[in-house]
Regions:
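A beta-strand edge to alpha-helix "cap/lid" segment located at domain peripheries
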Residues: 1-28, 40-144
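Short, conserved active-site loops that position catalytic residues or coordinate cofactors/metal ions
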Residues: 35-37
Length: 144
């Protein structure tokens, strides 16, 4: 199977794992992350962190914020380079209970995910997710 076709199949499974994450189950997503120590994650709940142990801990803590959810995806960019690196840039459209709330809340994340061919498959080596999906004034980066 060509690297691009194989990656398409992995993206489909990764999206299903993120759907599980929105329901409070971190295990399928954790399986996608690299076991190497150069793995990194940045999400809306915590600062950037790296290292397999710390990334898994952040996933386990982050998932506690979600239940009863689902995620839709808008692919913006997808590429595979030299057969060993791949990138997704997409909008994730979440509908989930957040932070113990009783109502399902919709929100969108802007996400960049880097994958590396590793151990006979594709593993996430970096994921950055944030809620910035519209233009903001320059002053918005200045802390109050």
């Amino acid at each position: 199977m060509a690297a691009v076709d194989e990656f398409d199949e992995v993206v489909g499974r990764y999206h299903l794992a993120l759907d599980e994450f929105s329901r409070g189950n971190p295990d399928p997503v954790k399986e996608f992350y690299s076991t190497r120590d150069d793995v990194a994650i940045a999400n809306p709940f915590f600062p950037l962190t790296s290292g397999r142990e710390r990334v898994v801990e952040r996933l386990e803590r982050s998932v506690r914020n979600f239940s009863d959810g689902e995620v839709g995806f808008q692919m913006v960019v997808k590429w595979v380079s030299s057969g060993d690196l791949a990138c997704l840039v997409e909008l994730e459209e979440w509908r989930t209970k957040v932070g113990g709330r009783e109502d399902v809340t919709p929100f969108t994340l802007r996400v960049t995910t880097l994958f590396r061919a590793e151990g006979g498959g594709w593993k996430v080596v970096h994921r950055h997710a944030d809620p910035i999906t519209t233009a903001r004034p320059a002053e918005s980066v200045i802390p109050e």
